């Protein structure tokens, strides 16, 4: 897969210095075990600095989570890459993201040419993310709603990416996963979380695998404007 962006490199801030820091980030991701070239190309291409506050722009290509307001964060690049790599293994076409946040994870998926549906419970974050999607020419379908219920109208999905942690996998989301599809989500509480992938077999059986220890904000119910 080749990342798809409408803007020219200069429009997304790929100057000499910016390209070097992106290259270094990709090399760090390789060293940390990310091997899927499509994922790495998307991580190199999508301008992470556009998804954070300007005051933090100098840290945009560090492999660390950063605050985006409302008690939320933009995930660590390694985590974004690992979740993306995991869902690409089932060759998805249609993906549901639960927790739009800054829009960065959704942008990575959209840059890979996937049909992306994303749900965010915090209205202000969703409005900002939509502006970024438009700026980058990305056709990401978004909804202001309680992410725990998913987006049933457009299901089932080949892949589901959950960007906030619940004590257990949410049944309503698992039910929206297509046969042969994969769901990747952080599971656990404040003190201990694991990144879990769940794959629905052709016979409907569910296979679950723990990928890595992680730290995410909690998956909450309800909506905020």
Swiss-Prot record:
Organism the protein comes from: Xanthomonas oryzae pv. oryzae (strain KACC10331 / KXO85)
GO cellular component labels: cytoplasm
Any one biological process term the GO annotation gives: methylation
Chief localisation class: cytoplasm
Pfam name, any one: PCMT
Name of the protein described by the UniProt record: Protein-L-isoaspartate O-methyltransferase
Family per record: Belongs to the methyltransferase superfamily. L-isoaspartyl/D-aspartyl protein methyltransferase family.
Lineage, opening ranks: Bacteria, Pseudomonadati, Pseudomonadota, Gammaproteobacteria, Lysobacterales
EC number: 2.1.1.77
PROSITE patterns per the UniProt record, alphabetical: PCMT
Enzyme class: transferase
Keywords, comma-separated and alphabetical: Cytoplasm, Methyltransferase, S-adenosyl-L-methionine, Transferase
GO molecular function, one term: protein-L-isoaspartate (D-aspartate) O-methyltransferase activity
Active-site feature positions: 75
Localization of this protein: Cytoplasm
CDD domains assigned to the protein according to its UniProt record, in alphabetical order: AdoMet_MTases
